[in-house]
Amino acid sequence: MNLMTTITGVVLAGGKARRMGGVDKGLLDLNGKPLWQHVADALMTQLSHVVVNANRHQEIYQAGGLKVIEDSLADYPGPLAGMLSVMQQEAGEWFLFCPCDTPYIPHDLAARLNHQRKDAPVVWVHDGERDHPTIAMVNRAIEPLLLEYLQAGERRVMAFMRLAGGHAVDFSDHKDAFVNVNTPEELARWQEKR
């Protein structure tokens, strides 16, 4: 499979950012560029089509030149709703989802997930210590199951990924690449480090 053309990259920026005081995390500046743009740029080196899932400040995200897709379900039901919304509005078979607050994803993310997925419809990153189910390669085939899961009021990403028949892919050699920004203090530390 030609990864560049058969996988749609998606920056997930649709959350409420409660731990950041409600500030839209994707728009926070890291070394002169918004967090979401770091993720989009990393995805664009691996894939030819990248979109953004955002529920606030869509015009700002659109100014970055990428298509912006809003959740089709109301009340910010979480990252799974963003995944569903993108699958409902994009024609691709495979999707690579990454949260907007993971600006240092590795350059071989798509290739490694694809290589290790075997026949699974869903694979996600495991950094050697913990799962990162929102950094995931997902096949369109799970869309009906995902819709049913969300309509039943479920929101747990990891539980859904397992229900869908997925498995983790080991990225313990890139553990630091998956640290995300959850607080203003963490963002300040990143500004100092990189």
From Swiss-Prot:
It is found in: Cytoplasm. Its EC number is 2.7.7.77. GTP binds at L12, A13, G14, K25, N53, D71, D101. Pfam families: NTP_transf_3. It catalyses: Mo-molybdopterin + GTP + H(+) = Mo-molybdopterin guanine dinucleotide + diphosphate. Mg(2+) binds at D101. Keywords: Cytoplasm, GTP-binding, Magnesium, Metal-binding, Molybdenum cofactor biosynthesis, Nucleotide-binding, Transferase. Coiled coil: none annotated. It comes from the Bacteria. GO terms for molecular function: GTP binding; metal ion binding; molybdenum cofactor guanylyltransferase activity. CDD domains: MobA (cd02503). GO terms for cellular component: cytoplasm. Its cofactor is Mg(2+). GO terms for biological process: bis(molybdopterin guanine dinucleotide)molybdenum biosynthetic process. Belongs to the MobA family. Transfers a GMP moiety from GTP to Mo-molybdopterin (Mo-MPT) cofactor (Moco or molybdenum cofactor) to form Mo-molybdopterin guanine dinucleotide (Mo-MGD) cofactor. The N-terminal domain determines nucleotide recognition and specific binding, while the C-terminal domain determines the specific binding to the target protein. Monomer. NCBIfam families: molyb_mobA. HAMAP family: MobA. This is Molybdenum cofactor guanylyltransferase. It comes from Escherichia coli O157:H7. The lineage of its organism: Bacteria, Pseudomonadati, Pseudomonadota, Gammaproteobacteria, Enterobacterales.
